[in-house]
Amino acid sequence: MNYMDTKTSFLRLDPNVVSSCAEAIKKEGWIFLPGKQWQESFSLTNEERISFSLYWEGLELDLHMVDNGSYRYRRYGSFEVEPAQGRITMLPHGPYVQSKAVNPLNGDVERHFSPLENNFVAHPFFSALLLGLGEMYNQVCGTAATWIARLHPYRIKAELHVPGKPTPEGRHRDGVD
């Protein structure tokens, strides 16, 4: 496992946003915040946002599309997140698997993706995001927990005669409540 030092980052999710989102999740079961509001909730500068977004250029073609599509690009990684300790640990790299019940198109298949880029994982926004969400979930559950985050950023490319399908398997579900 690879422990990530998160103490050097000054980026943090605004505690008021964490609390208000946690309350909304407890009440409604979900929350939606527009991208601009997320950016402001982290005091994220435009330069930090742009530098993080550039990692989507380095995603690799998803070769596991049952529909033979060549429009989805991704990488994969999993982490243990301990918000109360401010600690994130990268777990050993392995395949991404979803059941057929959750993903009828690509389920029950071990899908191997390239790992997340080291600089993506080391970006201050990345750790601030995982720790902030972990704290939000702790508030929802009312306990300091350790969370397992399975993360697969992806990018859909559409071209003039080749449509991109954001979720060709149907409405997004990850099998986690």
Predicted regions: what they are:
Residues 141-177:
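Catalytic core of non-heme Fe(II) oxygenases with the double-stranded beta-helix
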Residues 9-12, 58-59, 127-132, 157-163:
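A short linear-motif detector with a strong N-terminal bias
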Residues 2-6, 50-52, 120-126, 150-157:
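N-terminal start-of-chain detector that recognizes signal peptides
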